C-alpha cells in the first residue's frame, strides 16, 4: 500500500528538521533511512529538492536519488521519492527485476524512455560537479546495460564536444560506449580537480593512467600533473607533454610546469602558433622562446595574418620572473593565476601608442 500524500508531506517536513542522534530511531521508523543513515533534504538555489545522506553529504538531486533507489530495488524509497515529486519514468533506466518494474508501472511509469528523456536525465544528473556525484554518475551510466541497447549517437556527440579541448578525441572512436563514459567521468574529475574522484578512478582504472595525464595537461590542472609526475611512472616525453599543454589557449600553469621540467619553449611556441593559441604564443615568448621568424612563416602558411602582424614587431623579450623553473604547484598557481603576459602587454601598449 502506497503512503498517503499527507504521510509523504509529513515525512518531507521531518526530513528538513535537525534531528539529534538520540532520535534517529524516529527517522528510521518513518522510512527516512538509507545506507544505514538518516535522510535529510534541502532546497538548492534552483528551488530543487536535494537528498542528503551519509554517502552523499553534498546532496544529490531527487530524480537521481529515485533512480538509485530503483537500482537498489528499495521499494519504500521508490514510493517516497515519487510522492515527493521525482519522475518515476527515469527509473526505467535502472530497473533490474520484474517486481520493481511492476512497482514503477503502478506509480505511473511508461514502458520505455525516449532518447531525449535519457539525455535530459544525463544532463540533470551530471550538473553537480562534486567528487561524490561524478563517481555516482560513473556508477549509474558507464556500465548500464540499458544504454548499451539504445542508440546513443547524440550522447557520443555531446561527449566529443565536451572533450573537444583534448587532442585525443579520435581515440574515443575506437573504444566501447562504456569505456568512453568512464574516460569522460575521469576527465571531468581531473578538469575540476575533484581529488576524491581522481583517486577513485586512479585505483579502479590503472590502465587509464595516460588518460589522466592527458586530461591534466589539457585542462591546465597543474596540481594533478604534479601528483602524477611524482607518484607514477610517466611514459611520455616532456616535449610531448608540452605539446598537449599547448593545444588549449591560456594553459599557462601546465605549460610552465613542462617548461620547468625541461620542455623546449621554442617548440611550444610553434605548436601554439599552429593551433592559433595567441595567449600561449605570448606566454612562450615570456618563457624565452625566440623563434619569431619561423613562427611568422608558419602563421603565414596557415593564413593567420593577425599572428604575422604581431610577430612583425621587434619588441618581445623573456620575462625574468618566469625563468626560475619552479615546480611547486602552489607557487606556480600563485605566480600565474592572475598572470598577464609581459609581451602581450608590450603589444597592447604598442597598439595604443600607434593607433589612437
From Swiss-Prot:
Disulfide bonds: none annotated. ANK repeats lie at residues 61-93. One of its GO terms (biological process) is taxis. The keyword ATP-binding does not apply. Transmembrane segments: none annotated. The keyword RNA-binding does not apply. Keywords: ANK repeat. Belongs to the asfivirus MGF 360 family. Plays a role in virus cell tropism, and may be required for efficient virus replication in macrophages. This is Protein MGF 360-3L. It comes from African swine fever virus (isolate Warthog/Namibia/Wart80/1980).
Amino acid at each position: 500500500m502506497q503512503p498517503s500524500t499527507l504521510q509523504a508531506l509529513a515525512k518531507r517536513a521531518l526530513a528538513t528538521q535537525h534531528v539529534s542522534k538520540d532520535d534517529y530511531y524516529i527517522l528510521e521508523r518513518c522510512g527516512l533511512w538509507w545506507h544505514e543513515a538518516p535522510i535529510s533534504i534541502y532546497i538548492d538555489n534552483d528551488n530543487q529538492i536535494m537528498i542528503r545522506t551519509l554517502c552523499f553529504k553534498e546532496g544529490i538531486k531527487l530524480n537521481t536519488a529515485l533512480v538509485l533507489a530503483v537500482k537498489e530495488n528499495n521499494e519504500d524509497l521508490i514510493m517516497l521519492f515519487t510522492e515527493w515529486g521525482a519522475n518515476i519514468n527515469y527509473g526505467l533506466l535502472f530497473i533490474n527485476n520484474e517486481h520493481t518494474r511492476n512497482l514503477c508501472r503502478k506509480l505511473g511509469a511508461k514502458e520505455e524512455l525516449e532518447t531525449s528523456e535519457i539525455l535530459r536525465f544525463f544532463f540533470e544528473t551530471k550538473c553537480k560537479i562534486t567528487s561524490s556525484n561524478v563517481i555516482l554518475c560513473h556508477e549509474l551510466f558507464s556500465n548500464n546495460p540499458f544504454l548499451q541497447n539504445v542508440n546513443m549517437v547524440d550522447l557520443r556527440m555531446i561527449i566529443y564536444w565536451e572533450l573537444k579541448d583534448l587532442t585525443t578525441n579520435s581515440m574515443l572512436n575506437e573504444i566501447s560506449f562504456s569505456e568512453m563514459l568512464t574516460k569522460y567521468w575521469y576527465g571531468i574529475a581531473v578538469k575540476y580537480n575533484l581529488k576524491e574522484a581522481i583517486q577513485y578512478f586512479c585505483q579502479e582504472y590503472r590502465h587509464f593512467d595516460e588518460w589522466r595525464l592527458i586530461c591534466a595537461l589539457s585542462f591546465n590542472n597543474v596540481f594533478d600533473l604534479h601528483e602524477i609526475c611524482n607518484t607514477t611512472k610517466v611514459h611520455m616525453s616532456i616535449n610531448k607533454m608540452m605539446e598537449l599543454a599547448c593545444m588549449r589557449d591560456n594553459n599557462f600553469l601546465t605549460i610552465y610546469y613542462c617548461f620547468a621540467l625541461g620542455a623546449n619553449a621554442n617548440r611550444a611556441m610553434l605548436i601554439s602558433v599552429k593551433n592559433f593559441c595567441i595567449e600561449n604564443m605570448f606566454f612562450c615568448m615570456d618563457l624565452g622562446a625566440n623563434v619569431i621568424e619561423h613562427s611568422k612563416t608558419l602563421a603565414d602558411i596557415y593564413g593567420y595574418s593577425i599572428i604575422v602582424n604581431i610577430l612583425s614587431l621587434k619588441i618581445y623579450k623573456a620575462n625574468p620572473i618566469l625563468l626560475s623553473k619552479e615546480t611547486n604547484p602552489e607557487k606556480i598557481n600563485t605566480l600565474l593565476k592572475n598572470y598577464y603576459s609581459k609581451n602581450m602587454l608590450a603589444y597592447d601598449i604598442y597598439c595604443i601608442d600607434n593607433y589612437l
